C-alpha cells in the first residue's frame, strides 16, 4: 500500500480581501452563494486575484479535482492499496475515504468543496470526506501511517520509477498541488527522499498516474504465482 498527499494545494474560499470585488460578487450572485462561502477560482476571479499575494498561483481547485479523479478511479485504489489526502495552502487537511466517488462534473465538485469548507465533512450522515483545520504539513504527515516520505520535485534526483517503487511499500508520496513556483510549506525537511521522474516538469495528475501504474505493476508482480 502507498499513500499520496497533495501538498500546498491551491484550494481555498474567497479571501475576505476580495469578497467585495465585482467579479467575485457577480459570480456568487449567479450561483446564489455568499461570496465569502465561494471557492476561489482563477478562471472566474482572475481580475480580483491581482490584489492577492501570490495571486498568480492561487485559486486552482481544478488541480485538486483532476488529481482526485485520477487517484480514486485507479486500479490501485480499487484493490485497496491507496490512501489519498489533501493539504491546503491555509493548512487544512482533507482525508478522503477510498470509496468516495468524486463528481466528474467540475461545478458539482466545486459545490462539494464549498459544503466541505462550511460543514467540515460531507456527506453529513456518513462522511466520506473530512476536513481538519490548523494542520501544517508536518502535522499532516504525522497523521498518515507511513514508513518513508518521498517528495516529487523537478529538482530531485532522477529515478527509474519502475525500479524505485519496488522499495516503496507503505511509502507516503508528496506531490505539489499548485500550478507554478515552489512549495510554501517546509516540505523538503520532512522528506526522506526527493526524486524526479522526468527531465521536464509534469502536471501533478501525470506524476500521480505514473506512480499509480508503476506501483500497481509492482503489486501485481509480487502477488503473481511463481
UniProtKB/Swiss-Prot annotation:
Keywords associated with the record = Methyltransferase, Ribosome biogenesis, RNA-binding, rRNA processing, rRNA-binding, S-adenosyl-L-methionine, Transferase
Q: Which residues bind S-adenosyl-L-methionine?
A: 176, 181, 197-202
GO MF assignments: rRNA (pseudouridine) methyltransferase activity; rRNA binding
The EC code for this enzyme is 2.1.1.-
Highest taxon listed in the record's lineage: Archaea
Which class of enzymes does this protein belong to?
transferase
**Reaction catalysed by this chain?**
a pseudouridine in rRNA + S-adenosyl-L-methionine = an N(1)-methylpseudouridine in rRNA + S-adenosyl-L-homocysteine + H(+)
* Classification via Gene3D superfamilies: 3.40.1280.10
How is the subunit organization of this protein annotated in UniProt?
Answer: Homodimer.
* Name listed for the protein in its UniProt record: Ribosomal RNA small subunit methyltransferase Nep1
Can you name the source organism? Methanothrix thermoacetophila (strain DSM 6194 / JCM 14653 / NBRC 101360 / PT)
| Underlying gene | nep1
